[in-house]
Swiss-Prot record:
Residues 81-114, 217-247 are annotated as: Disordered. This is Mitochondrial intermembrane space import and assembly protein 40. Cu(2+) or Zn(2+). The gene is MIA40. It comes from Mycosarcoma maydis (Corn smut fungus). The CHCH domain contains a conserved twin Cys-X(9)-Cys motif which is required for import and stability of MIA40 in mitochondria. Residues 157-201 form the CHCH domain. The lineage of its organism: Eukaryota, Fungi, Dikarya, Basidiomycota, Ustilaginomycotina. Residues 1-28 form a transit peptide.
Length: 247
């Protein structure tokens, strides 16, 4: 039981490290300007992204861009927005004026949302068009990988570009379960190359070390829990044996 838990943790650790590096590029990054993202920000995105081993396989099918629906809600009428700020005395003094102008205010409430709603819809359309223009390094229709995609942040052309290409393509085309578990060796070669160039891949190295520390802590906890479970089972079996003997 204990060994199976440690094997599962080790496999999950390898896949999670692979997915942390590759999933941001596979999902695509929206580009709102002609110039691509800076190298530092692109490299940092690999360090920030993290997914669980179970969700890695499903994430492969989320490569194409999706646009989110935006609900357009009219703002509150001007008079209603002022109501909470009115003092009690002011409300009494202006009661008559409010009564005389009530029809006009009701009309404003009906007209104002009509004027503002098209603006909100226009914004939603613009954002939807921007999301449609998102780029992804992998095209599931053609099965090709665009190594020049800005979402890769130049990783395919850096000092460890060849190692990155091997690991990334292995992860993309992997049919193993969980996805990418058969790319551990290529991923390790890429990580070793990163450590040979700490001036370029400082963020990746620091993030990997932090992830290793976290996984080691989790494995230690799993081992401790496994020992506790084994001890508990031994106690229960011993108690059951004594009860059977006395019976």
């Amino acid at each position: 039981m204990l060994s199976s838990k440690l094997v599962a943790c080790s496999a999950g650790r390898s896949v999670q490290r692979i997915s942390r590096t590759f999933l941001p590029a596979m999902r695509g990054v929206a580009t709102k300007a002609a110039a691509g993202p800076s190298r530092q920000s692109a490299l940092s995105s690999y360090s920030i992204a993290a997914v669980t081993a179970i969700g890695v396989g499903a994430s492969f099918y989320a490569l194409q861009s999706r646009s989110s629906a935006i609900q357009c809600e009219p703002r509150q009428a001007w008079h209603d927005r002022l109501k909470p700020k009115e003092a009690k005395g002011d409300a009494t003094l202006h009661k008559d004026a409010h009564t005389r102008h009530a029809p006009a205010e009701v009309q404003d409430e009906r007209v104002e949302p009509v004027e503002e709603t098209p603006v909100a819809i226009e914004v939603a359309v613009e954002e939807s068009e921007e999301q449609t223009g998102q780029q992804s390094a992998y095209d599931p229709e053609t099965g090709e990988i665009n190594w020049d995609c800005p979402c890769l942040g130049g990783m395919a052309h850096g000092p460890c570009g060849e190692q990155f290409k091997l690991a990334f393509s292995c992860f993309v085309y992997s049919e193993a379960e969980p996805k990418g578990i058969d790319c551990v060796d290529k991923f390790k070669a890429m990580q070793d190359c990163f450590r040979e160039h700490p001036d370029v891949y400082k963020d990746e190295i620091e993030d990997d070390e932090a992830a290793n520390a976290q996984f080691e802590k989790e494995e230690a906890n799993a081992k401790s829990n496994g020992l506790n479970d084994a001890a508990q089972e031994a106690v229960e079996e011993s108690s059951g044996g004594k009860e059977g003997a006395s019976a």
